């Protein structure tokens, strides 16, 4: 059930939710730092050693051969293949609109200023292994990179107990245009992508979710390479009016609660009656879920509700929390969209469940968490590009404007800067 709190306590709620960020303890950071250093020095040998140690699999090589890749794909269910093809179309349709070109500005006296938009050359995608397998994450990470124009997109994922990869992951990688797959996970995979080994070339950026050791590794290699984010636990906030269907609201709250005992599920509503019905539905629906224990722990610790005086007040509180997923389960949701300032992704209306965005709708499901939607964005084509400016001044232009450059440089006491302009004005 959701614990009701009062509007006056919203600041405490916000701090409580933000405290769920992964605690990268000193012990974890030291362990991961040692793994990274080992991979930097010993490369493939270290990677294979850690695969044996952590995944209990002895491999001769990390790279997935084309034969193995194709063989795994053949094991996929036809209905899964159909669903993934449609999801890919939707994701591509949405992300293609994000692609932008550069520009050129021409001014008087032979001055040209421009900006080039260039794709990164190589990107590494981390895909978790273990019991869970997330082919949707492969599409969400790889397709924007390919649309951006990244030529080399590689994927790392831990091998299973048989030393291979899950068929659904293999198919998703092929569908998304991944160029190579390597059977390696954990901090050692992040280190290999960041620094390179005999088998794995270094990349420019690493994206994708992982456990606390993967998160620590991403944090430690940031600066050597770029990363997407250090993601916290999943979160959903539902704004619902009195006409919202309690069954729908409960189902959507549970869709995030089942992720993790630290996942948060928040309901902001104008109806005390709806809150009561939602709590009844949560008990009913959670009782039959395979991950019942995780759901119960999540709701006990991070399932909260506030009854507000208006939808505007609900959205105002939501803006302070800045949730990863925001659902506006209200009448005329488009009219209220402009009031939303901070949210990773917004789901409008009674029928737009958050799962649509997770798998199929086309918007990206790699979203800012832990309140970072106040200043950061979902993964997109922009995540895989860099912008470079260029400038051209003619002889006429430097003679006309060089004195101003010299004046500013001299005021900053950087005489060599001033001289660089001065010598061209002779």
Residue spans of the language-model regions?
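N-terminal Rossmann-like NAD(P)+-binding subdomain of aldehyde/semialdehyde dehydrogenases
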Residues: 1-121
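Short acidic-hydrophobic, aromatic-tinged amphipathic segments that line or gate anion-handling sites
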Residues: 2-8, 180-185, 305-310
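Conserved small-residue-rich beta-alpha loop and adjacent elements
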Residues: 106-171
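Short internal beta-strands
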Residues: 151-161, 265-271, 278
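Conserved NAD(P)+-binding/catalytic subdomain of aldehyde/semialdehyde dehydrogenases
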Residues: 177-255, 259-264
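A glycine- and small/hydrophobic-rich beta-loop-beta segment
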Residues: 259, 267-343
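C-terminal core of ALDH-fold dehydrogenases
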Residues: 320-426
